[in-house]
Structure formats: structure tokens, C-alpha cells
Amino acid sequence: MKKFLFSLCLLSSTVLASPQSELTERLNQNAGFEAGFTQKVLSPEGDVLMQGEGDVKILRPNLFRWHTQTPDENLLVTDGNTLWYYNPFVEQVTLMGLEKATTQTPFVLLTRNKASDWDNYSVSQNGDAFTVSPKADSAVKSEFIVRIQENGKVTGFSVVEQDGQRSDFDFTKFEAKKPAKNNFTFAIPDGVDIDDQR
């Protein structure tokens, strides 16, 4: 009888774990990772609008480097305070404060996982896929679906815009390791236009 009650208690605690707490626990499994990615942008009707690829490095909290190589090269990197967006084709770099730049995107949940970040979202779970939806009064309007295994391996994510357009990102060559901190700085190249929005 005691074994039965103990098993029932364990089962109850598992059932009572919310999707948000499960996602938080999985995100906390690793302090950083590196991966390649492929990207596909789909219209609301499911037509492929664009495909791309690149690589990403994340070191929690707040450090990330997102390098898109195709179809058009660009780089998004932050040192935890300043966010640089560099577009070599137009020879311009935009500087923003990290807090301001990430307030309205659920991507911030991958990079820092602070308790207060969850205030604007509700979370549902379907296996290893967690749908992070903005609450009605939130300034965030896009839905974020993160695919993460129990061991903390992030296999990809999707962003669904209000109009139904969808961007799918699938991670390849995932390595659960802390990238070196020197990946999260940016030296502005000579001769580029600087748009400082900090």
C-alpha cells in the first residue's frame, strides 16, 4: 500500500508540473550551446518564401551570436548590454540596447530564462515542442515554438507572426558547450555607416 501511495504521489507531481516549469527546467539543462541552422520562411498558405542557413552561439545569460550566411549575410551579436546588427551588403551596423531590443521577442527565453520574462507568455506542451504564446495584453504579437529534448538539447524553433507567416529554424551539429566569451564582441569595420539607437 505504501509503495502504491508513493507511486501515486510521484505521478501526481509529474502531472502537476506545468509546461512552463518543464520548459524552464529543460532550458536550464545547459548554460550555452553552438549549432548550425537552416531557416525556412513560409507564407500563411505554406509557400516557401525564403531559405537560409548560418550558425548560432548562445552563452546564458544574455550572450548570443547569430550569423546568417545565406541568402544574405548578416550578423546579430550581443555582449549582454549592446546588440549589434551588421549587414555587410549595405555596409551598416545598428547598435541597440539589449533590454530594449529583446523585450518584444520570445527569443529572449532561449538566451536568459529569467522568471520575469515569462510574465507576457502562456506555455503549452506537445511532447518536446513548447508553444509560447503572448498573453492578450502583451506587446509581443508573435507565437514562438521551441523544440527542446528532456536533456536540454534544442533542436530548433519556429516563429509564427500575427498574419500567419512562419519562420522555421532547425539546428544541426548541436553542441551543448559554453562558447568562448570572445565570440560575443563586435569590432565595427572601418567605413561602415553606424546607426546608434541606444
Swiss-Prot record:
GO cellular component, one term: outer membrane-bounded periplasmic space
Signal peptide: 1-17
Record has RNA-binding as a keyword: no
Pfam family, one: LolA
Location of this chain's protein in the cell: Periplasm
GO BP annotations listed: lipoprotein localization to outer membrane; lipoprotein transport
InterPro entries found in the cross-reference section: LolA/LolB/LppX, OM_lipoprot_carrier_LolA-like, OM_lipoprot_carrier_LolA_Pbac
Transmembrane segments: none
Keywords: Chaperone, Periplasm, Protein transport, Signal, Transport
Biological function: Participates in the translocation of lipoproteins from the inner membrane to the outer membrane. Only forms a complex with a lipoprotein if the residue after the N-terminal Cys is not an aspartate (The Asp acts as a targeting signal to indicate that the lipoprotein should stay in the inner membrane).
Family to which the UniProt record says this protein belongs: Belongs to the LolA family.
Subunit structure: Monomer.
Name of this protein: Outer-membrane lipoprotein carrier protein
